[in-house]
Swiss-Prot record:
The keyword Transport does not apply. This is Aspartate carbamoyltransferase catalytic subunit. Keywords: Pyrimidine biosynthesis, Transferase. The gene is pyrB. PROSITE patterns: CARBAMOYLTRANSFERASE. Its EC number is 2.1.3.2. It comes from the Archaea. Belongs to the aspartate/ornithine carbamoyltransferase superfamily. ATCase family. It is an enzyme of class 2 (transferase).
């Protein structure tokens, strides 16, 4: 089924066949003209580096152009204009809208308001579908396969939308097992656990590490904690460094959606396990592939 003109709000909106078509396009994508004469609106109501820059780069490399903002304070939202009116205005100017917002459901609301396709660049704590595409593409590109692997997901599994989307994306495949590795206060919400279709269990890093083919690490999402004291209790409670990796399986891939704070030590960067900078670089070809598939 074609994604042309479709909204991409959750990774659950994507079929495995769609995802693997995006992977194939991304693996050969360096330049193109699919967006020639098209304008993409970048509606970033929340800070971003990699996501915004890679969407902008992807648009330019496909021959398109972009408009937008990187902070709500620089728009009429600062004067009291509503989110709805802002989206309607962007819809009248652009052929597609990329939305990032701190509030859950913002991208879905934008999709209901706009005629142009809306791509969710991360909203709330549940959805970051294009990050999940990049994560899975990185594994697929290196391994050629995502099935029958053992995954560990380490970090903030309660407030981290990248981790939540990664886990939901794995539902499209057949992992051997998934280990959820997190402090007690950062365990996933029950809704996410109930949605998982693969074998999973809670573990600690030391016990799970020797089995892992992929370790997906995320930072503690300080900005999403409702109570600052809750953040203080869990910050710094986990760290991957080169000493713990002595027990790692040969060929282990360590991924991180970035930015990192202190959850992966700098000494890991020079090990053969570090794939997170390759992962970040994959943002441009994957988003090029997605834009070329979605924008009418």
């Amino acid at each position: 089924m074609s994604l042309r003109g479709k909204d991409i709000i959750s990774i659950s909106d994507i079929k495995r066949s769609d995802l693997e078509r995006i992977f194939r396009v991304a693996s050969s994508r360096f330049q193109g003209d699919e967006l020639k004469g098209k304008i993409i609106a970048m509606a970033f109501f929340e800070p971003s580096t990699r996501t915004r820059f890679s969407f902008e780069t992807a648009t330019l490399r496909l021959g398109g152009n972009y408009i937008g903002f990187e902070a709500a304070q620089s728009t009429s939202l600062a004067k009291g204009e509503s989110f709805s009116d802002t989206i309607r205005m962007l819809d009248s100017y652009a052929d597609g809208i990329v939305v990032r917002h701190s509030l859950e459901g913002a991208a879905k609301l934008a999709a209901e308001l706009a005629e142009a396709p809306v791509i969710n660049a991360g909203d709330g704590t549940k959805n970051h579908p294009t990050q999940a595409m990049i994560d899975l593409y990185t594994i697929w590109k290196e391994r050629g396969n995502l099935d029958n692997l053992t995954y560990g997901v380490l970090g903030d599994l309660r407030y981290g939308r990248a981790a939540a989307s990664f886990l939901k994306a794995l539902n499209l495949y057949s992992p051997k097992k998934v280990y959820l590795i997190c402090p007690e206060g950062l365990r996933p919400k029950q809704e996410l656990l109930d949605s998982l279709k693969m074998p999973w269990e809670f573990s600690d890093l030391k016990d799970a590490l020797p089995e892992l083919d992929v370790l997906y690490v995320t930072r503690v999402q300080k900005e999403r904690f409702p109570d600052p004291s809750e953040y203080e209790r869990v910050k710094g409670s986990y760290k991957v460094d080169s000493s713990i990796l002595k027990d790692a399986k040969e060929g282990l891939m360590i991924l991180h959606p970035l930015p990192r704070v202190d959850e992966i030590s700098l000494d890991v960067d020079s090990t053969p396990y570090a794939y997170y900078f390759k992962q970040a670089a994959n943002g441009v070809p994957v988003r090029m592939a997605l834009l070329s598939e979605v924008i009418p």
